[in-house]
Amino acid sequence: ETYHKDRYKVYHPKGMKSIFEWRVNGFDRMGQAGVHKIGMGVLIGLEDWRTDVTMMAIHLQYLRKHYWQTRYSVNFPRMRPSEGHFQPNVIMTDKELAQLIFAFRIFDHDVDISVSTRENAKFRDHIATLGATSISAGSKTDPGGYATYPQALEQFSVSDERTPAEVEQAVKAMG
């Protein structure tokens, strides 16, 4: 979510998730366990995204050095302003997100880059041909969302509401 240790405590003040070192060192535990693919990401909007992404890149380099047999994926989910909910501290534009994806592709040409349904369909369709390696489809964002109805506790809003079949058709149409 963020590599800013002091601010992390603000977002997770209690419980197991509140222990910053436990969260960050979780990637080492996965590597030591021989996990085939490890996904990393920072929640864009909590803190300065350039700092968070730089820290994640350094962390990725460390993990690659120590757990070279593991595959890695990254994502950069953006918080969006929404009435009545937590407001992002920093807003990232579409152009900045595209530049970040391009930069990360240059930084690590083997890393999988995922783009979530938080992004709109037009952006996802374009970025899929320019640097992203996977895009989600048909996502549910509420706890237990695939098993329970109706949606009650949505964690974030989905911008691309296409079904998996519709996303598949869009990808096929791109060639």
Question: For each of these PLM feature ranges, what is it?
Answer:
Residues 54, 65-175:
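Auxiliary Fe-S-binding modules of radical SAM enzymes
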Residues 4, 19, 48-49, 93, ...:
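Helix N-cap and loop-to-helix transition residues
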Residues 17-19, 44-59, 116-118:
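Active-site glycine- and acidic-residue-rich loops that bind
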Residues 10-14, 49-52, 86-89:
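Short, solvent-exposed loop/turn segments at secondary-structure boundaries
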Residues 1-40, 44-46, 68, 72-75:
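Core AdoMet radical
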